[in-house]
Amino acid sequence: FMAGGKPFGSAVVAQAFHEVFLYFESAIYLRFDLPIRRFLLELAPFESFDLEMARMVSGDNNAGALLDWLRRNTTMLRYDDIRRIHFWPQFRSFLLWELDHEYTDEKRRALFNRGGLYYELKEDYPHALECYTLGGDHSKVSELLIRNAELHPGMGHYSEMEKYYRSLPESEILASPSLMQGMS
């Protein structure tokens, strides 16, 4: 029990997170210029990213300068190596909360679809499929599954891709020999 006799539970944890997020919002986030805030929100959906992904997802050719400014003036970014960048988990949770408040579903889907394109160009099909699924682009999911099945016939990738195959309508699978082969 806490002070006041209230039991410690999920409601208390949710309230604590809410208060921390309100603090982050007023003490940190709102002090940034609009381009930095937009940049942070557009990268938040991704566990990690590199400069190329930051450019592609945000559409900002100035992404390198923005990342450099964030690196020099904040401690919110972690670098795995010279290329891979992450937000600190607590700050990423805040940014995702902020993203839910500031961006429409359509704008969030567009971010995931741009992330999907980045991964597709890198031939990282599992991440591309995840992004396109979250972005609601089922035609790209189907296209990538067909491409993957044609690139790796009979290689047993079905278990890795099963949830994406199952998300497709049966009629679409039956209309594509490559999709049927990929499921076998």
Task: Put a short name on every predicted segment.
Residues F1-E19:
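Amphipathic helix/helix-loop-helix segment enriched in hydrophobic residues with interspersed Lys/Arg
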Residues F1-G4, E42-L43, V57, W69, ...:
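Short acidic/histidine-centered micro-motifs embedded in hydrophobic/aromatic stretches
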Residues A14, H18, D60-A63, D105, ...:
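Flexible, glycine- and charge-enriched loops at secondary-structure boundaries
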Residues D105-M183:
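Extended alpha-helical scaffolding segments used for macromolecular assembly and cargo binding
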Residues A3, P45-S48, A63, R72-M76, ...:
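Residue-level marker of structural boundaries
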Residues K6-A11, D60-N61, L99-D105:
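Short, polar/flexible loop-turn hinges at active-site or ligand-entry regions and domain interfaces
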Residues L22-D100, A110:
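C-terminal boundary/linker of central alpha/beta nucleotide-binding cores
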